[in-house]
């Protein structure tokens, strides 16, 4: 019974953004970074209660707003900092930015924000989350999915890390294993953050 309030007390950080919209940063466990998939899963149980608690509803809208802002910073990233702080993975051989905690391309990182936004809208009827930021994020998601079908080459994403763990880096000069472009979307990393093989 304590996990519902504990999650809100220890991992959810709500504020109003510079644009006046709700902005909720959700820490993933003990790491002060926000994984797109994990943050969506962490707040998922609260969606069913959104209509009975206006503050909870606003917090959820803030998570969705933040997720789509993150996607617009980099749709290939899986985890983000709370601002341009840099971090331990800045030396990864990929297009790192100071807003990124980690840049491991995982298809679920783009699917979970869509799932959360849809369920929030379906439950609350609140369409305010579907604004210009959302339109840009959807455009970036669709572009990324198309790029990673790899019908027109390997796409812009590459990733390499100096590590002793084989599944923490990507083979083939950071492009991953060759694939036959049949229309499926290549996900370079699994939800576990391990490279696909």
Regions found by a protein language model. Name each.
Residues 1-4, 67, 185:
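Generic structural signal of hydrophobic/aromatic residues within well-ordered alpha-helices
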Residues 4-13, 72, 150, 190:
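Generic surface-pattern signal
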Residues 1-37, 62:
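Low-complexity, Ser/Thr/Pro/Gly-enriched N-terminal "stalk/linker" regions
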Residues 17-26, 86-104, 167-197:
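Acidic/His metal-coordination segments adjacent to aromatic residues that form catalytic metal sites
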């Amino acid at each position: 019974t304590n996990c519902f309030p504990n999650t809100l007390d220890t991992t959810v950080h709500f504020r109003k953004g510079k644009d006046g919209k709700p902005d909720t940063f959700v820490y993933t466990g003990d790491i002060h970074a926000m994984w797109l998939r994990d943050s969506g899963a962490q707040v998922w149980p609260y969606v069913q209660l959104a209509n009975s608690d206006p503050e909870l509803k606003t917090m959820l809208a803030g998570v969705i707003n933040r997720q789509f802002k993150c996607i617009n910073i980099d749709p290939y990233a899986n985890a983000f900092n709370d601002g341009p702080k840099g971090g331990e993975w800045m030396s990864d051989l990929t297009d790192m930015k100071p807003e990124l905690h980690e840049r491991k391309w995982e298809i679920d990182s783009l699917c979970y924000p869509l799932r959360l936004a849809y369920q929030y809208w379906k439950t609350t009827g609140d369409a305010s989350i579907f604004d210009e930021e959302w339109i840009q994020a959807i455009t970036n998601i669709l572009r990324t999915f198309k790029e990673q079908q790899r019908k027109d080459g390997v796409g812009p994403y590459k990733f390499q890390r100096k590590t002793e763990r084989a599944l923490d880096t990507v083979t083939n000069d950071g492009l991953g294993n060759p694939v036959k472009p049949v229309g499926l979307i290549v996900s370079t990393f699994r939800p576990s953050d391990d490279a696909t093989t």
